[in-house]
Amino acid sequence: MSCRVYPLLGLLLASALSPVLAAPATDPTSLLRDVRQAYGGAQWNHALALQADGKETGDDLSGPWQMLVDLRSGQFVSRMRNDVFSAAEGTDEQGRWREDITGLVHPLDSDEAHTVGVTENWLRRFGFLDAHSPVSYRALPDVQEKGHTWQRIEATPAGGRSVTLWIDPATHRLDRATWPSSFLVVTQHYGDYRDVNGLQLPFRIETSSANLAGNSDGSSVDVVEHYKVLDAAPTTELRRPDGKVRDVTMANGARTATTRLRVEGGIVLVDVSIDGRPPMPFILDTGGHAILTSDAAKLLGFETKGNGVSGGSGSGTMSTSYTKVHDTALGDAHVHDLTYTVLPYPFGFYERGDGEPIAGILGLEMFERFAITFDYDRDELRLSPYDQGEAPAAVKGDAVALRFTDDMPLVTAQQDGHAGTFGIDTGNAGYVLTFPQWAGSNGISSRYAAGLPIPTGGVGGLFIAHVAHAQQLVLGQQRLDNVVAMLTREDAGATGNPSEAGNIGQDILSRFNVHFDYRRQQMVLMPRATTPEWHYGMVGFRAEKEQDHADRFDVINVMPGSPAQLAGLKQGDAIVAANGKPAAKLSFGTLRDMSAHLPEGTPLSLKLADGRVLEMRARDMAPR
């Protein structure tokens, strides 16, 4: 495990320990001996598996929960359901897997998923009670937290991630465990220990995660009603669900469905009909899930349940709730009874001037049900269903293998001669993202850190990043030398992920026609009818609309030395027209198309609310 994790953990833990007083470290061998005795000692020799049944509460929703664990291998399955959705996850002989809240399964098979999975499986099977488990221990100084002393051990299972165990010296039982997982830090608290057949087992397990800025990314509480100690390891019960699609129908006997696709300011929009209503624009995002904006959910008359949080690009989070949609249709493809998350996106996210507002996002659940082709030449999206007779045919082209740490597909690509794991994110409307931890470890961060400062962000809020021309990007067999990359920040949430190299979005993907086939775990890049020219000229500002004055864009950032600044544009100015088109009729995306990714010298005229008219010409400002 890289030593860089320790200061990150320290940042998070420091805020929780008030005050913190370090004491000499306790010898781990003697401490673990006491722990093993406190948990039941030799009684564990006769336990081969555990089954826990109870209730899970999360996002203000509750329902039955069950977990089955093989205490020797660490294989497990955990299932929950509530009034809105069900979900499951596990490890079987094939590896880690997850069943999402829409009922379909995908593997968690990246290097990061494997590393984290080894440690989580070790914890789940109480691996610290196994004196023969292949794990290294390191004593950490005792700490005091709110008047209570905790003994701590850092444990690193073979092939796994280091985890800090917090032990109560009065009971010699585990109070909590903390470990990094992707861009989050996970904390699991154990309490309400009781005797079960001579074993001391926790009847309350609280799991929470936070990003590196310390903002919550969700939590759940599992309350065990009863345990079963099994003297035989389960096999069939631990296997993942078959993953067969049972909730899709194709109208008119269609084998393939087609719907309109367009790209607006780098944002991929597709037409989607909800419960038979006229089609509305949705973002199709491999890094996303089925989401309705709060405004769309209200307009469509959906009731919501639950109250959670969601993170993303940036360090902040957003509140969430849930609803069920009877029919989601993309052309002739219909998905029935799909669970949607409802998010209170701001007006500037969904407003499209004189166009229909963006109603939401579709993501993982579509790619699990269909092989999907983004045909940018024809401005259409094609969907071929799984498990409807003959499987979708393989597509010819440059096939790139996909893997998963979470729900976004990952590929191996190269930037500036260095290989790394990159997210494939059709919802990324901007530049290639380069994550600072990976860039630093490969010696290329200074090149980008000296680049143009530029505002960016998403669900987690805005932050300043830096852009520069990359030397080269290699994706599959494609070598691209006209690419601008953006160096993000370590505290940028999912876009500052220490386990990945970066994120590839529309700036690269739309240079090809792209086919996704999750059953084959591949993305296929196919040549466009005409090779598109790519430009990085910009005028250098960012502006957003507010609902109470939708007839103008408020300028929130002007880049130093940019054509916009030289023309006299300032933060706080209000744009009422661009190239003669009223701002009321323009979306964020269309204004972006008029002000960025342009050939150098492209003119832009901005009329401001104070009567000024500013003339400027696009310039490629990213250093080479």
Feature locations, PLM:
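Short, solvent-exposed loop/turn elements at beta->coil junctions and helix N-caps
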Residues: 56, 140-143, 193
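N-terminal secretory signal peptides that target proteins for export/translocation
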Residues: 1-4
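Flexible, processing/modification-adjacent segments and terminal tails
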Residues: 23-33, 95-163, 169-171, 180-181, ...
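N-terminal mature ectodomain segment of secretory-pathway/periplasmic proteins
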Residues: 30-104
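Beta-turn initiation residues at beta-strand->coil junctions
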Residues: 56, 80-82, 100-103, 155-158, ...
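Bacterial N-terminal signal peptides
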Residues: 7-19
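Short, hydrophobic/aromatic-rich segments at coil-to-beta transitions
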Residues: 46-53, 72-78, 146-154, 172-176, ...
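Pepsin/retropepsin-fold aspartyl endopeptidases
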Residues: 59, 66-70, 117, 158, ...
